[in-house]
């Protein structure tokens, strides 16, 4: 199918004129969402998919439409290498001027993919509430959803390092455990530090066959296998290369981070103890080993859950 779109071009006098351009279009919907986690490998994923011939990715990595209606500060100018990119960016401008969630127009942004696979990689979607998630999933029932999970201690430290580097978080004494905890209580950090809740929220509405959790641990240790698994799930050919980009290439890994001392690491682990155990139970997979990294017993966690369940049963029996 061909679509006609108005496009502004410059004539010989340097003035903008509106012309029509035609190009093949695909279904008006994103094929997938990547809903996090921030500092979980989402930039790596975007670069792998953007350079792959089976995918057409938006000209900017994080659209933020579902969480901020696109009203967000960007640190990098978006790509605009052809008319499809131009049309996409014009469409985003139109969406950002509206004060309501227009999922139909949002879906049409992805028509530029033609027969390829396309999606929205916005880690901030990990913070969406149940109402928005339900609306989005009901509107795009076939859409796949993936979540790149990372050990909460490591993820939070990486976010703090990025925040200081970009000037979003004031510099603090990174060797003082209690000062670090104060920064962990920053709403922008705390809301992104409970992957067990994020995954549980999305799983309530997404069909099991359309939802997958992947792990940052595998990006560090088995990037080839991780890339293959994600591409197969999304519908791409894992045997096709992502241009000249290798699976192990992760630019973010080389960026400067705050030095994490053993004392601060232990204090952060105490802060996230319950979340580490909740991740092991909710996410499974590589998350099962997270509590033991910090000397926590998962057996005691499940015993406490069982004890709470027994107490609840006795309480219900007493009420009846």
Indicate residue ranges for each PLM-predicted region:
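ATP-dependent NMP and nucleoside kinases share a basic, alpha-helical "lid"
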Residues: 127-147
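The conserved 3'-phosphoadenosine-5'-phosphosulfate
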Residues: 60-61, 68, 142, 150, ...
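PAPS-dependent sulfotransferase catalytic domain
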Residues: 98-111, 163-229, 233, 237, ...
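Active-site periphery "cap/insert" segments of enzyme catalytic domains
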Residues: 124-134, 191-199
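PAPS-dependent sulfotransferase catalytic core
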Residues: 1-122, 139, 143, 153-159, ...
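Short N-terminal helix/helix-N-cap motif within the alpha/beta-hydrolase-1
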Residues: 127-131, 157, 224
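Surface-exposed cleft-lining segments at the edges of enzyme active sites
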Residues: 92-93, 120-125, 178-191, 217, ...
